[in-house]
Amino acid sequence: MRRVRPLVALLAGLVSTFLLVGAAPAPAAGAPAQPVQVAPAAVTPQVEPEVEPVAATPLRVASFNVRCANCSRNDRTNKREKNWEVRRTKVISQIKAEKVDVIGVQEASPGILKGTKTSQFEDLAKRLGEPYQLTNTYRYGCARSTSYKSCTKVDNGASADVRIIYNTERLELLDQGSKQLDKEKATSGPRFLAWAIFQDRTDGRKFFFANAHTEPGQSKAKRALRKRQANLIVSTIKANNPDNLPVVLVGDFSSTKLTSANTVYDVLMKSGLVIDPLGNTKKQKSTKKATAEKLTNVKYFTLNNFKSKPTSYKGYALGAHIDYILVSKSIRVLEYKVVLSVKNGKFSGVIPSDHNMVRATILLP
């Protein structure tokens, strides 16, 4: 006969243990039923996917001294210099051909063009057409901004013949302003810094753009004035750029590495605010210090004075530049170009100005 008592006893013990540990005790007679305790299900934490930063899109910036209209009419350099009404077509075609996103122009006068009611800078912007637009449309910093006569000064951001024009499809203007760079009246008219803060519509990046034209001349007094103007450029940019956005500074600084003193350049380099992507320091001959990744026509002097052919210097791979594009160290410069139309070593067609436009393609950080 088979023995089953030990097995029965074992099963009884297991049932008893289950009732004690895994099951709630039965309520007393007449007592309300107790809720059954259910262990919560394990929750898998949600991990947010890493968002890749949007890659920067190449941006084209430029500087162009377009030669004042009245200068061509009243103080012509030579027979190759044409009136503004002839030159402007070439100025506009070069800006468009270079697909510039933002440009600082100098000598785009607020004075009225002969036989019109339009100033030179207004004429340039109008003929460039959409999507180009001025950052500031006031002619003068006066209560009646259309005329300098009987001027009651106001700060409306006007900047005389120093102007910024930008591509509205690519850039959004966030802020703008100006600063006069000479308390005393300069012999050739007041000098200004114009500035603007932009946001790139393609990737959301912001940057600070500034354009200046400092006092020309190589006398001791002129050099001293330019030094004061350079220091004012630095302090104005810092005061209006509290977020320390990357800076692009362009302009005609009225001296070169070959002049007795390259005052503005030296002050700007010492400030640490910007660097020169050409590395075009005093008497520099080679391109070994350049940080720009591609160099185009940089051997040519940016001042052409309406000569028949562009000026270069024997033994100098980097020309003497009077027009500059300087950038924050964090900005990558893909190309730096001196823009000119040359055929068989000579200027081709109408020479747009006594200066050659300079253009850089950059990547913002």
Question: Across the structure, where does each feature detected by a protein language model lie?
Answer:
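N-terminal, active-site-proximal structural segment of metallo-dependent hydrolase catalytic domains
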Residues: 2, 21-127, 142-145, 154, ...
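Active-site environment of divalent metal-dependent phosphoester hydrolases
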Residues: 70, 110-113, 143, 216-218, ...
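Structured beta-strand-rich core segments of catalytic domains in phosphoester-bond hydrolases
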Residues: 108-214
